[in-house]
Amino acid sequence: VCAVSKQPVGIDIERIGAYQPNVAGRVCSDAEQKLLEQCEDPARLFYRLWTLKESYVKLTGTGISVPLSQITFSFLADGRVESNQNRVQFASFPFGDGYWLAVGEKMR
């Protein structure tokens, strides 16, 4: 994957594996955990959330020293990603067979 931007970018790609509720309990916000509980396919949603969080920490360079549960994502009906992180825009989508890709980019 290649990204070209005048602003910093963070990218993450993960293979969709088994849903890990114990990990989700540590890294997902309360709102995200509710989404996972209501979801028909929690594994896909978990890895979508995970790649978004990873793209953010790669973008900022903070690593996982930031509590990932404080970075919250939600999804609009048209698939766009919303976040509580100001001045960052995100995109997330299936990539290849069985993978999620997420990109975060600082806004000007």
Region roles according to the model:
Residues V1-R108:
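Core catalytic alpha/beta fold that binds nucleotide/phospho-ligands
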